[in-house]
Amino acid sequence: MEEDAGAASPAPEPEPEVDPARELEPEAGVSESISRLWTDVMGILDGSLGNIDDLAQQYADYYNTCFSDVCERMEELRKRRVSQDLDVEKPDASPTSLQLRSQIEESLGFCSAVSTPEVERKYPLHKSNSEDGCVGKGDWKKKNKYFWQNFRKNQKGIMRQTSKGEDVGYVASEITMSDEERIQLMMMVKEKMITIEEALARLKEYEAQHRQSSTLDPADWPDGSYPTLDGSSTCNSREQSDDETEDSVKFKRLHKLVNSTRRVRKKLIRVEEMKKPSAEGGEEHVFENSPVQDERSALYSGVHKKPFFYDGSPEKPPEDDADSLTPSPSSSSLDTWGAGRKLVKTFSKGESRGLIKPPKKMGTFFSYPEEEKAQKVSRSLTEGEMKKGLGSLSHGRTCSFGGFDLTNRSLHVGSNNSDPAGKEGDFVYKEVIKSPPAPRISLGKKVRSVKETMRKRMSKKYSSPVSEQDSGLDGMPSSPASGKPDSEHVDKPKLKAGGSVESLRSSLSGQSSMSGQTVSTTDSSTSNRESVKSEDGDDEEPPYRGPFCGRARVHTDFTPSPYDTDSLKLKKGDIIDIISKPPMGTWMGLLNNKVGTFKFIYVDVLNEEEEKPKRPTRRRKKGRPSQPKSVEDLLDRINLKEHMPTFLFNGYEDLDTFKLLEEEDLDELNIRDPEHRAVLLTAVELLQEYDSNSDQSGSQEKLLVDNQGLSGRSPRDSGCYESSENLENAKTHKPSVLSTKSSTESNLKSFTRSQPGNYPTLPLMKSGEVRKQGEEGRLGRGLAPDTAKSCDVPSVTDLSKNRRSLPVSICRSCETLEGPEPVESWPRSHSLDDLQGDADVGKNVPTEMPETCSQNVPEVPQKTSACTSKALPRGRDPTADVMLLTQSKRFSDPPKTMAKKLDGSVVASNLGIAPPQCIPRDFEAQPPVKPGLTRTSLEGLRKGHDHHPLGTKEGVDGEQSAPETRTQSRHPSQPPPVPAKKSRERLANGLHLVPSPEAPILPLKKASPASPVSPSDCPSPREPRPSSGTEPGSPACTRPPPWLAELPESTSLQEHGVKLGPVLSRKVSCVRGVDLEMLTENKLQAEGIDLTEEPYSDKHGRCGIPEALVQRYAEDLEQPERDVATNMDQIRVKLLRKQHRMAIPSGGLTEICRKPLSPGCVASMSDWLISIGLPMYTSTLSDAGFSTLSQVPSLSHSCLQEAGITEERHIRKLITAARLFKLPPSPEAM
């Protein structure tokens, strides 16, 4: 069509064409009709009716084309339409067959037709619309032109046709109506009440109706017009072109539909919104939005009135029926009158002139304006109605913008409407339009089926609203039709407006069914159907009954795009049942009976609800107070709510994380009160039991008891421990651990196995206190396991396995430990000597220990620990007992035993908890050397001791040195700050020592079953050398090795156990560890280095300590780099936790070395100094005039000395780094 149009008249030459057309056609009738058309057209042109240029401008804007192009295109369309009109008119004037008409058209060509701007315009519009989808922007421009041309042509053509085939008055009225409607459409478009596409669709519908009715042989004329519109067979025989054109037009429309779907949807949405406010104006609104309803009504009513007047009975009934039937009177009437027209066409032009007139009137697009006016006014257009109206107007072809969809629907609607109305014309129309193109018929059937489906579904949802609107429509004269149209109307709104309604409605719900609907009749109906299904289906039945993975409360309103059919509309406070939580962040859930997607950022997951289902059930089972729903609830019950901020700040927001809490975590969280620690650990155990044991009620009970004990300080029996006495004494589970080690062992094993995975979560524990507590508990457990191994294997195993479950191991009170102490002869080794003695007992196990450690690290620490504990207990019972005693003493006498505890802790740490970290350092620094190992162990122990006394601070610092500290803490039940996270990290990374002292400790204990693994294996992940060193060291330090051996096997000393092999070395390492942490911290303070600031810690708490700084500190403090790195990270973590910031322990030296620790882009002198580990000279060099990076290469020994740097090693470092320094592309002055 475009080509034809372009060929016909690239430039607007309406007049020339008009003249030939007039010459060709009976001039009188044509001139009369044309004169009327031109009057209307001129009214539009002169602005009285509206400005065509405005419309053209809008089209130009709409299609992103030049105004001139649009005008040209419109002119071309107009000319084409004129030629078509001439062709049609000729057939009309002398009723001829389609062939005759097509022949005439061919002979006449487009030029032969009288140029009726209206007719042409309409055709062009039609054409342009149909072309819109398939044509490019250029086509669109042309379309715009055609739109205007069609506008005029249609009007003129209608006049001519009417004059020819019908009374001029009728024609005039028809034309007037079309003009009015066009003006209204233009005004509506101008006012943005409707989109250009909608206007085009209406014009097309009008044209189609027009052609059908205006042509004496409606079928012929419409066919001709259709071909013309298609432009595929403009000069070809109209018959063939009609069928083919119809098909092609359909497809073009479908294509266009797809293109215009978005706009149509938007329109529909707008219309829907308009329609919602005024449901009664629906019919009129089909063409316009509610505001324009009156105008449209006037336009349509004007046209309609005329048709009614002229056709009186035939058209009116159809219109009434159509109106009532169709949500949009115009569309229904169009369909009806279109059908009538086609019927007329089908009949003979001459035969059905009376009919034709009525159909024409109806076809006059505005034939039913009067009726419609009332109807329109009475009800607001529904978007569906609007679409219908447009579709019926375009009647299958005319609607190019939503066109195809609308047309098919309108056809169906029209058919249905007319059928109910009992219109022959409708049937004929259907036949004429449908029968020629098989595809159309199939589409019609599809549309019908879709409508049926949509009606069924949507009627339920929208039955009330739609019925109201429909009632307005149905209220119209044609009630019979309205009954059916009502449902159809419902369907239509669903298909079209429904889509839009849905999209509006669902746009609220985040689902827009419209998007699919307008794409194509079938597609749109299908998508509509689907969307309706999801929406309507929800009302009918829950769309999803399957399992939910949780619930979430919406905290932020979210209204999805109307094109987003999958998203849910979220309103604050809505509770969404989560169906799936993909990692991408777009979750799926059920809300308001609609399954859709939503972004997790808009909701708060209700952990309580997710976790509660199990717990509540358990609680109910127990009949005791329900299980706590949140950490806050839990802490409230155990009267420890003062720790709530600590837990929340450190990542223990939910019970799943909280139940991973361990003693070392308590240490890190700086929760040092033994009672609090015991209660917390007991609560953790109970939570774990709830989850792991079917007898959750018992666990709950224990929890309650534990809480009671805490609050009432009354003995509590967790049920895990054999003696309530132990629980009483320790309120931690140490006594019970010893007594119930065997019983808890299995539980602990299960916990341990499940916990290793949890440890990573534990590391989340942000509070140094919590970690320390956990560590202490673990140490206690670890020591207890060691002790138990020596004396009480089952107890030890239980302790190691039940780290969490066995807060007992942390026994806060000496009594608790003492209770179990009897297990072994070591009554309470307060001093390292005692521990050493124990170690001696376990001397034989040193190698075993290291092996265990290595295995444990790789394996799940807990499991291994359990096994190891079992294995070691035989040979290490005494040592374990001593360890336990020491721990119990420490727990019972934290202050006085502090030193002893530290020693014990050191031993314990060496054995199970601290050793992991210490060992890695020692291993790395002095892997083969026993003394080195011992020293490291001792350092770690000292650190652990320091941590215990220091509290979280050291514990936190000890996160890197946490291996030692934490290990120690566990045994002494003093909290080394290394978080459980670290231990896990170690296991996961294979480097347990530095990265996660806690984790290694736990893993080692747990991994003790892997005692066969050599110490080197244990540390091997991170510091294989230390492990090896430990092995040799273990034998050398006979006493320590037993401890270590015990720990590895029972608690799987973990890497550190190997490290700590010798008790003496442990003492030394303990002392050194404690001293090293204090020394490191003091040195950092003296140098003004804040490890909590960038680049040492990023905003997420990750470690960024430069390797150069670690190396320098190792040199300055004459300590192994590994120990220094661990201590520095522990200090960093401790400080971060004190600030209630996130703290992620690093993997220690190996991790630091793995990633360049330079601040990244060195942009200033300060950055450079930080990267080389000498940040304290920033101000010194700045004062000396070295403030920019460009001056770095010029640094010299004398300059540095003059600047006041006296440390020779530092000067050498600075000069070396300055020589290696390369200026960045754009250095910035500091």
Swiss-Prot record:
Q: Identify one Gene Ontology CC term for this UniProt entry.
A: membrane
The segment(s) forming the SH3 domain are 547-608
Q: Which GO terms describe its molecular function?
A: mitogen-activated protein kinase kinase kinase binding; molecular adaptor activity; protein kinase binding
Q: Where is the composition biased (Polar residues)?
A: 461-470, 517-529, 737-758, 852-868, 962-972
In its keyword annotation, does this UniProt entry include Nuclease? no
Q: Where is it localised?
A: Cytoplasm
For region Disordered, the annotated ranges are: 1-30, 211-249, 275-337, 439-566, 610-633, 705-792, 818-875, 915-1045
List the SMART domains.
Answer: SAM, SH3
A GO BP annotation: positive regulation of p38MAPK cascade
Protein name as annotated = SAM and SH3 domain-containing protein 1
Record key words, sorted: Cytoplasm, Phosphoprotein, Repeat, SH3 domain, Tumor suppressor
Instruction: List where Low complexity composition bias occurs.
Output: 1-10, 324-336, 498-516, 1008-1019
Q: Which PROSITE patterns match?
A: SAM_DOMAIN, SH3
In residue numbers, the region (Required for interaction with TRAF6) covers: 844-852
Which InterPro entries does its entry note?
SAM, SAM-SH3_domain_protein, SAM/pointed_sf, SASH1_SAM_repeat1, SASH1_SAM_repeat2, SASH1_SH3, SH3-like_dom_sf, SH3_domain
Biased segments, Basic residues type: 615-624
